[in-house]
């Protein structure tokens, strides 16, 4: 056995934590009953529990070193985060162990995870304002929240107390658990602030004398780490589940088991001390119950022997095993327990009835606790700032959540009001239905049904528009449903705020026995339920619904789903019931035949054709049934196309409303096989859509080379044709391509291959599109350097019409007498992109040298030097123009190189590689570059690049 050293005495408690329950340290208590203990959490990110446990234990063992005084460091924090992400696929792309640089990280915070004092302290954190954080009301978006207001902007410290109250009340108006306030974490100097917070902790913890002072310092800094949010993901696991517990164990305290750990953003330090103490108390309870061999039922969840066995089998943490075998004989366990009890003693004074509802089980103790309590105390709802499980709830709510039968009996005896709604709008009946405890439901129903307002109470809706019946359907048992329906006052078809009825919720939550019970009770079948059945591709359930309710055969949505599921037997039933075989089934007026093709079932397609389905109908976009072949899976397309064209060959060249025939669809999905089949069937390639695009305009961007070659063989003139934006197919494809670093090389090779077709066919490379861009302009903007060089060698130019006109209209006097103005005016005629501008300058230089551009206006190319007079003003101005072009080229080159990233070794390597492998190739192929003195050292962002020409 390994002997324990003094750095982390609280490891004694971690060792005592029952192995089969250790997952509770990482899974929020609010999820235990709903998600079957650890299973829901683990299913979202497989491997996360083992990773988090190994991180906690391995770091704890590292901290626990002989003769070494522990001091927190940024390096330790990074190691915790890296270990939390080990073997967790979901986190690998988030760079475990690496800090954010400028990546935005945001999340919503509901009122249930905030307090007035917490918001006040949050707004007072100076580093949030300095670092560019944002906080305020808004709406969630795909790339982060859209703020209606940012409270950090122009924040006046004197206004913070009143502002904090107003913010909390605004959050509550939207709902206790609903989110309408968002936080965008610090964007600048994350590493600097992380180091400052760490040093602040190391300094302050040394000055603390009492355990409460130390606890406050710990939670204050954990809170700062949390709001800094230095990592892209798993910040909670890193700081709350790992670092916090290490710091607690360093003080000789047990690790924390939270009901709701996500309160470290907008709770105050004092409030967080209570939250953490409550979580420590949970750990003590779990350990004590395990020692007494009594079932652990904290927050109403008890894991079965089967679940415990499955978890132990899954458990894989070598460091945890080491801790389980450590020798604690040098420690004084009694002293540790007394220290913990003293720390937690302050909890006894707070929320006695509410805490009793969760933690007391002895009927005698419960009776004594409630003996002298009045009605207001029994029905008290705790206000903001308390541990989250208490806020807004009465003792009755908590007794139901915890499955505390003895407490519920005593509360009922004391006439507790079971119709009171918490801040989420839930009554005790809602929680009984959600927990699925038939005994508790029976007790509450008995009380409620004896009241005059029973109908009203039974149908009370929470903030989500759900009654207790909705929760019973979603989380309960058939027995619960039966108990509620037999009251004969439950509205079984009432929808919640999202439009879901009880039967829909049961189906979505895989409560199939409850679904059957409700179906047999005559529950209505909504379109939303049918959509859920379609999403699950559940033919069996649709068949079950039809068998129970034949009226559904007249429901158009049900027919659409039967078609989409590809079920011939179900479709037959609808047609026999008199449904029109060509009835439009979607808002786009897709027919049953179209949707059957979409489903990819040749048997169903053949059946509908046999029954007389019309092949000539189109949807609102003019798509025929042959167009719909390409909405099906690739493996089904050939069979479907053969069935349809055998019935109606004219569909092969029938265009849709945009002018695109089915061949276009084959090109869009890059299906070489089907494109070849359609071409062999006689598909034409000379069509144009409404924007003048031919088939190659689509093919060149989307398709592999073989399809394009097949089309070009059919008609090579398509390469020349320009659309309404004046682009030929190559030009258009280049314009539409969105370049990404990961695929840039592959994209450029594709265009290099395509350019061979242009050069072979003699396509004009210098036509300008509607925006005045040539092919070379666009290739430069995409930084396809090898393609640019190839095009330049073939005679491609940038668009120099504007600077060329300027030079042709410039006279010698304007050039020679006002050289600075001339240079600036010429610079304005160039493109803003330095790469394109360099190429424009090169084209101007070459054309001037070759006398294709005459500048100044009076310059004659063969003008010589007079022996007596020397060079004329026009000749001098001509030379000045060439000199200015060289200066501008040099400045644009400097600008281009100066913009290259150079912060960090990897960025410097990438910039150097970019220059050596790509940019240098372009520059060396520009004639003017040979006339410019190029530097061997160039300043880039944050570094100097070595340039070897």
UniProtKB/Swiss-Prot annotation:
It is an enzyme of class 2 (transferase). It is found in: Secreted; Host cytoplasm. GO terms for cellular component: extracellular region; host cell cytoplasm. Disulfide bonds: none annotated. The FIDO domain mediates the phosphocholine transferase activity. PANTHER family: POTE ANKYRIN DOMAIN, POTE ANKYRIN DOMAIN FAMILY MEMBER 3C-RELATED. This is Phosphocholine transferase AnkX. It comes from the Bacteria. ANK repeats lie at residues 391-420, 424-453, 464-494, 498-527, 554-583, 588-617, 658-687, 691-720, 725-767, 771-800. SUPFAM superfamilies: Ankyrin repeat, Fic-like. Pfam families: Ank_2, AnkX_ins. Keywords: ANK repeat, Host cytoplasm, Repeat, Secreted, Transferase, Virulence. GO terms for molecular function: phosphocholine transferase activity. InterPro entries: AnkX_ins (IPR054037), Ankyrin_rpt (IPR002110), Ankyrin_rpt-contain_sf (IPR036770), Fido (IPR003812), Fido-like_dom_sf (IPR036597), T4SS_AnkX (IPR050016). GO terms for biological process: regulation of GTPase activity. Residues 155-289 form the Fido domain. Signal peptide: none annotated. Virulence effector that plays a role in hijacking the host vesicular trafficking by recruiting the small guanosine triphosphatase (GTPase) Rab1 to the cytosolic face of the Legionella-containing vacuole (LCVs). Acts as a phosphocholine transferase by mediating the addition of phosphocholine to Ser residues of host RAB1 (RAB1A, RAB1B or RAB1C) and RAB35, leading to displacement of GDP dissociation inhibitors (GDI). Phosphocholination of target proteins also impairs accessibility to GTPase effector LepB. Can act on both GDP-bound and GTP-bound Rab proteins. Its EC number is 2.7.1.-. It catalyses: [Rab1 protein]-L-serine + CDP-choline = [Rab1 protein]-O-phosphocholine-L-serine + CMP + H(+).
């Amino acid at each position: 056995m390994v002997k324990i050293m003094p750095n982390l005495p609280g490891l004694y408690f971690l060792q005592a934590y029952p192995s089969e329950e250790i997952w509770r340290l990482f899974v929020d208590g609010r999820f235990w009953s709903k998600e079957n203990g650890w299973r829901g959490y683990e299913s979202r990110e497989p491997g996360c529990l083992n990773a988090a446990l190994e991180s906690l234990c391995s770091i704890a063992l590292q901290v626990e070193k002989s003769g070494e005084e522990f001091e927190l460091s940024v390096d330790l924090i990074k190691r915790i985060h890296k270990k939390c992400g080990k073997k967790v696929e979901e986190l690998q792309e988030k760079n475990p162990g690496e800090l954010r640089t400028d990546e935005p990280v945001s999340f919503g915070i509901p009122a249930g995870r905030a307090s007035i004092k917490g918001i006040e302290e949050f707004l007072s954190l100076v580093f949030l304002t300095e670092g560019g954080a944002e906080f305020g009301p808004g709406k969630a978006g795909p790339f982060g929240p859209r703020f209606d207001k940012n409270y950090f902007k122009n924040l006046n410290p004197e206004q913070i107390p009143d502002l904090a109250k107003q913010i909390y009340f605004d959050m509550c108006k939207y709902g206790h658990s609903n989110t309408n306030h968002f936080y965008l974490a610090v964007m600048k100097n994350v590493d600097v602030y992380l180091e400052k917070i760490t040093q602040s902790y190391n300094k302050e913890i040394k000055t603390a004398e009492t355990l409460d002072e130390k606890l406050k310092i710990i939670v204050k800094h954990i809170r700062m780490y949390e709001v800094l949010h230095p990592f892209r993901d798993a910040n909670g696991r890193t700081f709350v589940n790992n670092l916090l517990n290490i710091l607690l164990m360093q003080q000789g305290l047990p690790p924390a088991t939270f009901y709701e750990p996500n309160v470290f953003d907008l709770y105050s330090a004092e409030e967080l001390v209570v939250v953490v103490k409550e979580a420590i108390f949970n750990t003590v309870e779990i350990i004590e119950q395990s020692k007494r061999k009594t079932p652990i039922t904290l927050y109403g969840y008890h894991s079965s022997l089967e679940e415990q066995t499955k978890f132990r089998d899954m458990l894989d943490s070598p460091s945890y095993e080491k801790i389980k075998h450590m020798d604690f004989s040098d420690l004084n366990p009694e002293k540790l327990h007394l220290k913990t009890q003293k720390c937690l003693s302050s909890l006894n004074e707070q929320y006695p009835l509410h805490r009793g509802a969760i933690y007391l089980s002895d009927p005698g103790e419960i009776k004594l606790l409630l003996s002298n309590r009045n009605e207001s105390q029994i029905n008290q709802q705790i206000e903001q700032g308390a541990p989250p499980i208490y806020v807004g709830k009465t003792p009755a709510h908590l007794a139901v959540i915890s499955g505390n039968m003895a407490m519920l009996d005593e509360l009922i005896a004391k006439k507790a009001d079971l119709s009171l709604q918490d801040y989420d709008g839930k009554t005790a009946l809602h929680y009984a239905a959600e927990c699925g405890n038939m005994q508790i439901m029976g007790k509450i129903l008995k009380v409620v049904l004896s009241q005059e307002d029973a109908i009203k109470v039974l149908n009370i809706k929470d903030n989500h528009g759900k009654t207790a019946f909705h929760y019973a359907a979603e989380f309960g048992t058939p027995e619960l449903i039966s108990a509620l329906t037999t009251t004969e006052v439950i509205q079984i078809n009432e929808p919640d705020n999202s439009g879901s009825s009880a039967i829909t919720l049961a189906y979505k939550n895989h409560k199939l026995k409850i679904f059957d019970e409700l179906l047999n009770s005559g529950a209505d079948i909504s379109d939303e339920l049918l959509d859920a059945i379609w999403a699950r591709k559940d033919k069996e359930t649709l068949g079950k619904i039809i068998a129970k309710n034949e009226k559904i055969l007249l429901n158009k949505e049900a027919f659409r789903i039967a078609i989409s599921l590809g079920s011939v037997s179900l479709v037959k039933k609808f047609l026999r019931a008199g449904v029109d075989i060509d009835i439009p089934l979607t808002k786009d007026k897709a027919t049953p035949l179209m949707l059957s093709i979409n489903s990819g079932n040749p048997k169903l397609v053949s059946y509908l054709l046999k029954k007389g389905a019309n092949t000539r109908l189109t949807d609102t976009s003019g798509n025929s049934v042959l167009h719909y072949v390409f909405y099906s899976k690739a493996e089904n397309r050939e069979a479907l196309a053969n069935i349809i064209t055998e019935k109606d060959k004219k569909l092969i060249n029938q265009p849709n409303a945009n002018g695109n025939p089915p061949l276009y669809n084959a090109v869009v999905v890059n299906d070489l096989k089907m494109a070849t089949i359609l071409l062999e069937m006689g598909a034409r390639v000379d069509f144009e859509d409404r924007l003048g695009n031919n088939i190659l305009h689509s093919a060149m961007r989307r398709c592999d080379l073989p399809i394009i070659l097949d089309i070009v063989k059919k008609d090579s003139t398509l390469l020349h044709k320009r659309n309404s934006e004046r682009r030929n197919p190559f030009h258009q494809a280049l314009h539409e391509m969105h370049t990404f670093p990961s695929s840039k090389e592959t994209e450029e090779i594709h265009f290099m291959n395509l350019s061979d077709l242009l050069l072979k066919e003699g396509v004009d490379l210098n036509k300008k599109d509607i925006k005045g861009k040539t092919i070379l302009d666009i290739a430069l903007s995409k930084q396809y350097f090898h393609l640019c060089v190839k095009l330049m060698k073939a005679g491609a130019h940038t668009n120099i019409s504007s600077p060329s006109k300027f030079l042709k209209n410039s006279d010698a006097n304007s050039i020679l007498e006002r050289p600075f103005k001339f240079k600036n005016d010429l610079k304005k005629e160039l493109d803003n992109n330095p790469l394109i501008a360099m190429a424009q300058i090169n084209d101007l230089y070459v054309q001037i040298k070759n006398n294709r551009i005459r500048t100044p206006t009076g310059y004659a190319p063969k003008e010589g030097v007079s022996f007596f007079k020397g060079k004329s003003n026009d000749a001098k101005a001509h030379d000045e123009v060439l000199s200015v072009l060289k200066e501008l080229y040099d400045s644009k080159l400097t600008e281009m190189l100066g913009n290259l990233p150079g912060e960090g070794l990897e960025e410097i390597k990438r910039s150097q590689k970019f220059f050596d492998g790509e940019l240098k190739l372009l520059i060396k192929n520009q004639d003017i570059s040979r006339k410019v003195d190029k530097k061997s050292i160039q300043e880039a962002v944050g570094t100097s690049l070595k340039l070897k020409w």
